[in-house]
Amino acid sequence: MERYKALEQLLTELDDFLKILDQENLSSTALVKKSCLAELLRLYTKSSSSDEEYIYMNKVTINKQQNAESQGKAPEEQGLLPNGEPSQHSSAPQKSLPDLPPPKMIPERKQLAIPKTESPEGYYEEAEPYDTSLNEDGEAVSSSYESYDEEDGSKGKSAPYQWPSPEAGIELMRDARICAFLWRKKWLGQWAKQLCVIKDNRLLCYKSSKDHSPQLDVNLLGSSVIHKEKQVRKKEHKLKITPMNADVIVLGLQSKDQAEQWLRVIQEVSGLPSEGASEGNQYTPDAQRFNCQKPDIAEKYLSASEYGSSVDGHPEVPETKDVKKKCSAGLKLSNLMNLGRKKSTSLEPVERSLETSSYLNVLVNSQWKSRWCSVRDNHLHFYQDRNRSKVAQQPLSLVGCEVVPDPSPDHLYSFRILHKGEELAKLEAKSSEEMGHWLGLLLSESGSKTDPEEFTYDYVDADRVSCIVSAAKNSLLLMQRKFSEPNTYIDGLPSQDRQEELYDDVDLSELTAAVEPTEEATPVADDPNERESDRVYLDLTPVKSFLHGPSSAQAQASSPTLSCLDNATEALPADSGPGPTPDEPCIKCPENLGEQQLESLEPEDPSLRITTVKIQTEQQRISFPPSCPDAVVATPPGASPPVKDRLRVTSAEIKLGKNRTEAEVKRYTEEKERLEKKKEEIRGHLAQLRKEKRELKETLLKCTDKEVLASLEQKLKEIDEECRGEESRRVDLELSIMEVKDNLKKAEAGPVTLGTTVDTTHLENVSPRPKAVTPASAPDCTPVNSATTLKNRPLSVVVTGKGTVLQKAKEWEKKGAS
């Protein structure tokens, strides 16, 4: 007898000890042992009294009918005992129940029509199972579609789920604001009964009371909620919850009082005003205006994955959910015909670029706090809530900062902001997509050139890493698009008084330099209309310059330029050949028979001007030598050959950007040589490491001392790690070399022009003898770099597909390493 008393006391003490351990921080091994002991203790107490569980689960009666049923079933259950006799335990032991919430949560329980027994279990209500469920569009989901949940399929609709059961984890209910078994709508339109708990501003949904990890974990801060009352054909009250960064959640509740109670708790947790709770007067946050512009559509295509926590769920585009939903049983022909139309009108998540603020967990004094974070003007601002009424801490300047992912087993999506190695802040996102979005935002604002693929993501699987990288690249691209440089074709012309640079850093020839003093002495017209008409736009249809206008022709008739041109034409031989065609452009300044005449022209010709060609893509000018406005004059045969050569070389250099091309070729060549030299060094180091590895393996085979053997194995592991690192660096180097080679080929082929090139073919193929033309009968000169010339220009950028194999290999290596 004493043995049984000692065993009973041992079990009691063990139960108390396990409860004490629940309050302690234990290691993973200790947690496993504790859970094993708790399970053994539960099994022992359950097997020692088989009728205890039944009596306990049916002791709470609502009316006399249920009480009579329980009394009728009790003898039948006792008759099934192995020994044919009732058990020794006649009454159920007192089990610890979860703490009740504050009294303010249940003021309206007194208004219930059906009187209920006042008991602690009465607080946890449950939704009655439904026979059929109707979607928002009135289509009944086929009842033949079986649920994926075995418990729902076997027990869900046969008997109500009593709470709490003896195996229920009371730990789940600790510090909970409200909890109950509710119906939750799945993405196929079916309903699943789950244990819903609101704790620490989060909604937790458990598949059953035995589970320790929630199937759904959503932060309710900033979320909106709508109460949809029970309709005629429906059997449930609905609460539609729209979180900030998760899918829409629909909960089914049994009574209006329960729905209003949950609505009030969710509104208190979310921090939103309660005025917009009723349907039709919904309070929608700013972020939802971008993401959910059609709330009714969003409810139709709910997505709550049953294969993992939806904290890391990736929201699907409405059209994909539409296809999944319409493919269920009982769909109509009209729905199939409308699938294509819905795809065309569905909203793409393009507004993602506008989301520069959301809730993040911030590490403050070794504690994680939820803060509303916003990126604005290269600063990261922290607020207590989304209303931005109270600043949580001082803004953080992002200029020059580094953003480094810092995942841990407990915080997979955490990252740090560093400045010169010093940690300024540590943040945590709620999903892989949100983490990637914020990485891209912070990298863009800090001005960092780091590729998101270069980061190391420990404790994160390959799928989530790819999601983080793709989201980061997407936000980077959208931020670059948002803050891109102004486009001249859209933003209009630049200001007139701005100093514009030359197209290229090309040294002009001595001939052009000799004309510059005359340009300085030239009186520039102040009329803005003349300035506007002086530009020849390369991407438009060629128009006449103001030099060909009647007013300008009259103004130039009395200028010394025409007298110089007349002198030049009179000095030419009488049997001059046919002049150039009107398609040929005006060439350089009129040259006489000798250099002395050219020098004498300089002080006498103050009206010579350098025409400019406006390139809209980069808002730059190309300087050309003075050209004749109304007459086409070629270089006379008696002119010195060096003048012609300098003329052609200068034009070619201006056209091709010779100095820039040579500089790019030189730079890429040096970069290629440097990378190849580094590659050879890595190869030599790898060969040496492999040699040492072979020698170590041979030594390991011959070694018999255990201590020496352990040290050799450790050294071998270190060499293996070093080999992997060197191999990874070699792969990166190969990719860099491939990129440099491609750039070098492009540079050698010619400069990557800015959408235009200066065509000087006409300058080199000028007829040796000009035709003297009077100003009255001057033909129209086609502007240089006209649109027709540009169409015939060959492509200077060749798209290549090389290097993809190495790129794929690198991606697979990174996925394998993670």
Swiss-Prot record:
The modification Phosphoserine is found at residues 408, 484. Residues 175-271, 353-447 form the PH domain. Keywords: Coiled coil, Cytoplasm, Phosphoprotein, Repeat. Residues 652-749 form a coiled coil. Residues 85-94 have a biased composition (Polar residues). Interacts with SRC. Interacts with LCK when tyrosine phosphorylated. This is Actin filament-associated protein 1-like 2. It comes from Homo sapiens.
